């Protein structure tokens, strides 16, 4: 993937960081956004770790080229400025819409507040998931699409989850992910004449910093590394039938099986189904 240019939003930690590392390992040029630039700043973050500076250090030995941007995706102008900067190279092949502050403060005063009923949910959680997570996916894609349309090839991925279809512990989460799926589907409709794909991708349970901070609340036996999702993204880009997958929802672990991919520890996660979520 040495000639591939990707943009991953929200990559200082979690799934975004893993996607970036996996694509860099494949030799791609990867542009990554995040609010947390330094490790000093990371210590003050609700998740306590993960920075663009740390990503740079981890990526130093990988084949690809990493470009990082401090960006608050709650500010449209910052999102648009990043895409303009990426577009100066007149190429953008892959966009992974992953920016997502909705997992912050999942545990407060040793209580897992994320699963409280909707009438006990704070408004800031709506703002994080909808006004930042969902909105920034639209703003990023809107800015990136003209570059892809010009080149007659591209891939836009909205990171989503089963909560789009089934109750998964948090009403706001379900609303945000359902909208992410619909957005990807409708993106695909508009982009199809231009040979640009858009789809929603469901990770399984990913061992992100937030999940590991609340590890006692999760069964990690079938969990995935953050890099696993990136391997699937690379598989999608190589797929000669990518346009047939456009507009649809895909489970990352199922695609990994189809592509013959495994996780970084050679584990092959079992694809989750609706029955696992229920």
Regions found by a protein language model. Give the residues of each.
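Short-chain dehydrogenase/reductase
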Residues: 1-90, 101-106, 110-117, 124-125
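Hydrophobic structural elements of the Rossmann-like NAD(P)H-binding subdomain
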Residues: 96, 157, 198-201, 211
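Conserved Rossmann-fold SDR core element
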Residues: 23, 91, 181, 191-206, ...
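C-terminal helical subdomain
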Residues: 200, 218-278
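Active-site loop of short-chain dehydrogenase/reductase
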Residues: 4, 91-92, 148-160, 193-197, ...
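A short, exposed helix-loop element centered on a Lys and neighboring polar residues
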Residues: 141-142, 185
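Catalytic loop of short-chain dehydrogenase/reductase
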Residues: 101-110, 114-125, 129, 155-193, ...
